[in-house]
């Protein structure tokens, strides 16, 4: 290329002045459900796979999630990096598909519950395929900064670092994210910046080397909005716990039917788990109960928070997000036999003996699990409602899993940290109750009062 032609290229507004390369690994932390829109006649929804039958995360899905995160903080920055159709602004960023390795596929069941009768709806049973946690793949994204964007170069560089930090902290994508699915975290995410005005840096980009690039090693830091609510509560298991799953051949055993195990505790990648769907269901039911007892909140209050899907196709995405709850090594599974009782005679029913295999805590009052929930765009009234529900979980007023009538699924709170509007509230178990500072107690009481006032109608 002649000197004149080179000068013309470098003076063009479309000339590339910098490349930012983001790279690392993404690891699936909870079941991932990115549906293909197809079924196989047995499972209602199958995971998206390539022609070789391997699951992958589309780059478009990652771009959509990251754009939504940025947009919640600064819509102008989101338009700058990801483009805007109305302004004919093209996207600066290109994100590759993430091909998942070591993928294990399982099928999760679901059932639609009638909110009034608390029973399953007719034809409400469904299932879907998921990629179990532990699958991982290589992540790569490239940001191209051109001469006409030179004034925004610094902002884009800072945003790239912030997105890398967010990936290290974790994002949620795919279906059922409000119920704990699709949690993905980055591993060893690096941001390499190549300044094309420097020959060595340009050469390093062309050769795929990082030696001449400005490297940023990302750390786990989320982009959190001021009105986001986040709670993390450490729990011990007071009773048995059984979120039912079909037993394998070993648990089924042989011999008489009544001695065979009918249900075992659900597990995911070797760890016992309370699904986010179960946590969401328990919280929603308790929220409905509290709202009915405390005041007149109408359908809009919980509909805006929990989401809805109506017969007229009107939909609202849930702003409440629950997560899968994984149990540690402090529990063990034990066979537990039951006898069905005839409620008229008080005697046992014929063929009424059955056996399940729930889990029990080995050591009393030791941390067994951590339950998390988050609300985006949370109001004071919604935060107050969540505090009441967290109190019910802490004190064992709410139970999870099956056999609740028999006392199963009861928790005991040990420690909790709640973040809202830039403040952190801390609670710990203490003799005779909950240890919390006077300042935090007053602030949390004001949030509960805001919830009560929201239910007062003129």
Regions found by a protein language model. Name each.
Residues 1-458:
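Small/polar/charged residue-enriched interaction surfaces, especially the RNA/DNA-contacting tracks
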